[in-house]
Amino acid sequence: MSVSPLTVLSLDASTEACSIALSTQDNAIFQRFMLAPREHTQKILPTVKAVIEEAELTLADIDAIVYGQGPGSFTGVRIGISIAQGLAYGLEKNMVGVSTLQAMAQEAFAAKQADSVYAAIDARMGEVYFAHYVNQDGVMVLNGKETVVKPDALMETLPASELIAGSELVGTGWAAYSDLQEYFANCIVSDIIYPNALHMLKQGQLLIEQDKAVAPELAMPVYLRDTVTWKKLPGRE
């Protein structure tokens, strides 16, 4: 069954980066991406306004909202979902969350036709948020599960013989933990280090077509780490 084209707004604030993307009913794309540590609250709504104005639309034209559900900065994930919920409530529209790890893998496919991507975001506290994604008809699909893990433990549970040579390595985790990067030496370190709302649109639209968008009050973040054990580090979120 064909689905009528939708106008979809996507936003992410889960890392040091802040991004907004808009896909219109005629498949035009408008976007912004910026590094804005600790400025997400001030940047997101004005940027949403700018993107919508560039598209010559209004907020009322938006059919659904896609948000970066995490994992990432605890504060950033909360900011992103809260702003997305506020917009969705006001517009009486549904929302759908997309993994930040999947978004980076999807960008690697879009940029380099990558068939296998290992994504790792620096989770602080000596850990990474990690996942492996593989290409299925142009969509990067999770192989296994997303996890928060110490690099040493990851290397112990993932034999070097099972690593897929030539895979792209995306995210901040590889530069943060050089021993982990060395373990994946038969892979390619990508210049994709932050999730981008632009590359959440494809997965978000697929989920919307599958009727998986939910009311704002049902939208949930994905932290992976138990918030009870979350520790604030000096100068870090």
Where do the model's predicted regions map?
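N-terminal beta-alpha supersecondary unit
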Residues: 2-69
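Short glycine-aspartate micro-motif
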Residues: 8-10, 66, 76, 116-120
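Phosphate-handling active-site elements
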Residues: 55-60, 89-98, 112
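DPxDG-like acidic metal-binding loop motif
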Residues: 66-100
